């Protein structure tokens, strides 16, 4: 399971497993704030095909093809498009894409930080941890879940403190 904004982290993380059909690849996009129509999840929300930065891809856009504003607690996932590689993986069914809201990511951040005993994840992989937390109870106890914790929370400390009501 990997977070997906533009998609480079997931592409690198999945590289070793992409040819193994028995391994499910799950990409988690930024669903934005709960109750808001703004998000950064073009794959999950069936955004139309468009061109962004010279590449054809799913893009969050208006009826005229103009890029729309996105919103996410995670600056690293706050992006209106996604790599053409992920568009291909979605279309072929090789990867499954979902999203986690800002609130789900923050809850996952707190749970992982409290219980795992390693450096707290940044807000990007907290979206992936949110998906792992959602699906784990539905899986066999023999199932192995691997989550890419691709950054630590030091870079997000101001956002996290603000959202949790702490002063820095």
Where are these predicted regions, by residue range?
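Glycine- and other small-residue-rich loops at beta-strand/loop junctions that grip anionic moieties
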Residues: 1-3, 98, 121-124
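Secondary-structure transition/capping motifs at alpha-helix termini
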Residues: 18-24, 137-141
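Active-site/ligand-binding loops adjacent to catalytic centers
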Residues: 22, 27-116, 162-168
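Short, ordered loop/turn segments at secondary-structure junctions
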Residues: 30-33, 125, 150
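Glycine/aspartate-rich loop-and-adjacent alpha/beta segment that forms the canonical ThDP
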Residues: 147-168
């Amino acid at each position: 399971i990997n977070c997906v904004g533009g998609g480079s982290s997931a592409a690198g993380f999945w590289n070793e497993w992409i040819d193994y059909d028995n391994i499910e690849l799950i990409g988690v996009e930024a669903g934005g704030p709960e109750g808001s129509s703004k998000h950064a999840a073009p794959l999950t929300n069936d955004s139309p095909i468009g061109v962004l930065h010279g590449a054809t891809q799913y893009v969050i856009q208006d009826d005229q093809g103009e890029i729309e504003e996105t919103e996410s607690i995670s600056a690293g996932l706050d992006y209106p498009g996604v790599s053409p590689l992920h568009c291909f993986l979605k279309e072929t069914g090789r990867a499954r894409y979902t999203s986690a809201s800002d609130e789900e990511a923050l809850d996952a951040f707190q749970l992982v930080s409290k219980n795992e005993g390693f450096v707290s994840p940044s807000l990007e992989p907290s979206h992936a941890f949110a998906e792992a937390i959602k699906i784990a109870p539905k899986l066999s106890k023999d199932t192995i879940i691997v989550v890419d914790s691709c950054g630590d929370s030091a870079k997000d400390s101001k956002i996290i403190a603000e959202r949790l009501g702490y002063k820095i």
